[in-house]
Amino acid sequence: MRHWAAAANITISNGTTSTDIEDDFKDMLNGLESSDVRMIRPAWFMHPTRKNHLINLRDSNGNLIYPEMRGANPMLYTFPVFVTTSIPNNLGAGTDSELYLADMVDAVIGEATDLAIDADASASYVENAVMQSAFSRDETLIRAIARHDFAMRHRESVSVKTGVAWGA
């Protein structure tokens, strides 16, 4: 999704305080809503370290700021939160990450209906850093290739916050 976002919707994090975090969320929501994104099925995506920071964040009275982030189905601003290590947490200074907000109704996954299958008895492969010959080992190698693609119907339907240092 990172590279499908409109340039105007890719912004740098405001900082690490609770107010900065709120501003990050506000910026992302404003980016989508100001672009007339329908917000039919919006969702947040973040690295586990960022989620764990939010679930433990407290105000000056000791109250949880985001209690809805706790539990099996975390929510943020009434939208579901999906956690993945596919979002790096070693960017920028080495501990920065990114945060995504996208209207998933505009996400499209394409999948080719054919599956390419090849068999070859003369191919080679690497096993434990040693080149192995299927021919000399009396083996047949089989390869299956499925084709997939992902796109957003509208670039404005994705907002990315970069340089996210909170929770590092």
Question: What does each of the following model-derived ranges do?
Answer:
Residues 1-9, 33-49, 81, 131-154:
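Long, contiguous amphipathic alpha-helices that act as assembly "spine/axial" helices in icosahedral shell
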Residues 1-34, 76-77, 82, 160, ...:
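Alpha-helical scaffold segments that mediate packing/assembly in large oligomeric complexes
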